[in-house]
């Protein structure tokens, strides 16, 4: 669960925004690229306009990773550069994201559909900085717990990210098959100290199958992901570190584990398996059904290759959508359920002598206990209405639901439910060679139930607990607006300029968090 509007599900783009990241007094939210309008839309039919200009679509793509096989013959390329700034306050985001960020990012994606095969891929590089980062200095702490290093300093961190991925698919009669993969890397280091605090390698691979029936396309996709992070840190004399029980932003702490350490070096391993099944309609008024199961295992280990703690997590996701198409109008209604359960294990070791001459010893596990449990669920409803006019497109959407988070370690617990509501409206206007778009988004979250018992901790822990209480339990209000102007160089090429601004307020505070972003886009789309 994120805190800022643009960190939510509905954005003024055809893909979700990247998570916020990076610099001195600032933080970003990356608006990801639109599928570009590349025809003289003022002179085309409504159905063609709706397809090209559709920048917000809540329905999953038909065929999952094989989606190019179920589109018309085309070649598509989109490139986007963005510069974004975020300035916030305590409680708007979780402590590990800092109080301000700034980021530059360059993103490119492309796809092609030929007679017998299709392919799509993407690449991205981003460089950013964040300031006043307190607590956990890992790159992705939510993936690894119960063992997490908690740092009590406030740091200025620089973060570099890159990723590359894609899928190649082939169709034979009604059968489609595809293979794909991706690699992502992140390096995070202090602004004054160039030694890396964290290095990340994230590799994933997938295999997908699909089959076309008279009324449906059936698709199945299996994914495997392997993630590792090397983490090293040197502290000031007065700093403390703690091993944290952590669940999607929430830590429950055992003060008996708290230690004063000048340095720490840990390696984290994360492995994930996922299976997704989908039935996508090929005719009007039929529902889309999609279910997914995910299992992952994560642990941290020292330089002695000893597991400190380990977690097991199971996730279940279900989606049901009903699309209704009436000539120039389209209505989509759906429900979405997410459920995740994670268990953390504490591991104890004893020293075993393997050989006396020479003297060789090793650490052997002798005791494992399920000390930590966490459950998260999210129930959402979706509603989307789109109306295509001869030279314009109007789109209105809503996503709302109830999110629940429960964590427990020993006698300590944190239980919370909150209502999350998102609303967006988009209007796009087409001319012979120009077009413009205006998108307005609103966010509101409200805690409806909470129950918590914190351990009695030191002052810096109390500050961290206060930030978590603000984030989860105080109401959040936000508004964001995007204006984009585009020019068609040729019938197949388009360039665009977009400016985004927004704010978010927590509770009755008079100090909001501010966001602004500048984006430049180039798009190419050739339909055959």
Question: Can you name each region flagged by the protein language model?
Answer:
Residues 41-131:
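N-terminal, post-signal peptide beta-strand-biased segments of exported outer-membrane/organellar beta-barrel
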Residues 73-80, 115-121, 173-177, 214-220, ...:
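Outer-envelope beta-barrel architecture signal
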Residues 77-87, 121-127, 170, 179-185, ...:
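Transmembrane beta-barrel strands of outer-membrane/channel proteins
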Residues 100-106, 158-164, 197-205, 267-273, ...:
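Residues that define the transmembrane beta-barrel architecture of outer-membrane proteins
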Residues 134-148, 223-269, 297-310, 351-361:
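Short, flexible helix-coil linker/hinge segments at the edges of structured domains or between repeats
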Residues 257-393:
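Long, internal scaffold/assembly segments composed of regular secondary structure
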Residues 512-528:
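Outer-membrane beta-barrel "beta-signal"
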């Amino acid at each position: 669960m994120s805190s800022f509007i643009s960190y939510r599900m509905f954005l003024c783009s055809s893909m979700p925004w990247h998570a916020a990241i990076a610099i001195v007094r600032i933080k970003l939210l990356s608006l990801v690229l639109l599928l570009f309008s590349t025809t003289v839309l003022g002179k085309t039919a409504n159905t063609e306009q709706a397809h090209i200009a559709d920048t917000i679509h809540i329905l999953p793509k038909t065929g999952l990773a094989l989606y190019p096989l179920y589109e018309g013959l085309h070649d598509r390329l989109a490139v986007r550069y963005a510069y974004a700034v975020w300035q916030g306050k305590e409680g708007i985001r979780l402590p590990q994201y800092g109080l301000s960020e700034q980021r530059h990012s360059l993103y490119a994606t492309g796809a092609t559909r030929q007679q017998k095969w299709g392919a799509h891929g993407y690449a991205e590089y981003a460089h950013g900085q964040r300031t006043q980062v307190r607590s956990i200095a890992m790159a992705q702490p939510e993936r690894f717990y119960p063992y997490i290093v908690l740092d009590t300093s406030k740091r200025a961190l620089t973060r570099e990210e890159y990723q590359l991925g894609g899928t190649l698919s082939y169709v034979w009669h009604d059968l489609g098959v595809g293979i794909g993969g991706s690699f992502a890397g992140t390096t995070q280091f202090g602004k004054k100290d160039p030694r890396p605090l964290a290095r990340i390698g994230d590799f994933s691979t997938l295999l997908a199958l699909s089959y076309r029936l008279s009324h449906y396309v059936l698709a199945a996709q299996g994914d495997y992901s392997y993630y590792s992070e090397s983490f090293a840190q040197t502290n000031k004399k007065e700093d403390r570190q703690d091993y944290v029980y952590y669940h999607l932003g929430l830590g429950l702490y055992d003060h008996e584990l708290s230690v004063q350490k000048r340095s720490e070096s840990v390696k984290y391993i994360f492995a994930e398996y996922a299976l997704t099944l989908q039935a996508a309609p090929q005719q009007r008024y039929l529902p889309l059904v999609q279910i997914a199961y995910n299992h992952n295992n994560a642990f941290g280990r020292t330089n002695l290759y000893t597991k400190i703690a380990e977690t097991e997590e199971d996730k279940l996701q279900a989606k049901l959508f009903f699309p209704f198409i009436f000539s120039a109008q389209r209505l989509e209604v759906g429900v979405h359920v997410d459920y995740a359960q994670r268990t953390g294990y504490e591991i104890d070791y004893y020293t075993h002598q393997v050989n006396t001459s020479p003297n060789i010893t090793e650490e052997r596990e002798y005791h494992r206990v399920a000390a930590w449990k966490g459950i998260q669920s999210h129930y959402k409803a979706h509603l989307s209405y789109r109306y295509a006019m001869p030279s314009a497109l109007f789109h209105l959407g809503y996503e709302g639901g109830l999110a629940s988070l429960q964590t427990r370690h020993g006698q300590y617990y944190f239980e919370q439910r909150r209502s999350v509501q998102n609303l967006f409206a988009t209007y796009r206007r087409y001319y012979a060679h120009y077009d413009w778009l205006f998108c307005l988004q609103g966010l509101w979250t409200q805690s409806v139930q909470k129950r918590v018992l914190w351990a009695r901790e030191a002052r810096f822990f109390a500050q961290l607990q206060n930030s978590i209480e603000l984030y989860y339990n105080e109401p959040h209000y936000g508004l964001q607006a995007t204006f984009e102007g585009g020019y068609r160089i040729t019938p197949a090429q388009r360039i665009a300029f977009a400016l985004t601004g927004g704010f978010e307020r927590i509770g009755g505070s008079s100090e909001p968090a501010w966001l602004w972003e500048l984006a430049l886009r180039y798009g190419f789309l050739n339909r055959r």
